[in-house]
UniProtKB/Swiss-Prot annotation:
Subunit structure comment from the entry: Heterotrimer of A, B and C subunits.
Keyword Ligase: yes
Family according to the record: Belongs to the GatC family.
EC nos: 6.3.5.-
Catalytic activity: L-glutamyl-tRNA(Gln) + L-glutamine + ATP + H2O = L-glutaminyl-tRNA(Gln) + L-glutamate + ADP + phosphate + H(+); L-aspartyl-tRNA(Asn) + L-glutamine + ATP + H2O = L-asparaginyl-tRNA(Asn) + L-glutamate + ADP + phosphate + 2 H(+)
HAMAP family, alphabetized: GatC (MF_00122)
Pfam families xref list: GatC
Protein name: Glutamyl-tRNA(Gln) amidotransferase subunit C
Keywords per UniProt: ATP-binding, Ligase, Nucleotide-binding, Protein biosynthesis
InterPro entries hit by this protein: Asp/Glu-ADT_sf_sub_c (IPR036113), GatC (IPR003837)
Keyword Nucleotide-binding: yes
Taxonomic superkingdom: Bacteria
Gene name of this polypeptide: gatC
A single GO molecular function term of this UniProt record: ATP binding
Amino acid sequence: MIDAAQIDHLTALARLELSPAERRTMQQDLTRMLGYFEQLGRVPTEGVQEMQRPVSLVNVLRDDAPGETFPSGVVSALAPETQDGFIRVPRTVDTE
């Protein structure tokens, strides 16, 4: 079971400020999670071969082949604003 000192330590590391109710909930949730790990630790695994990956490495992507595209004039005509053949869009990343 997780005790109050461990909750204090975890909240300090995570820089969390929790109400008493949130602390109780966190303590209960973490205790329950650790209980699940204890259950997993008791599963008999003798004779079970370890896996490097849970799934086989198979490329499920299609071949990269050129296909039909729209002429640039059609796409540019649909864009609200263009400049030098490129579509202008609002800035999404600050450079500062």
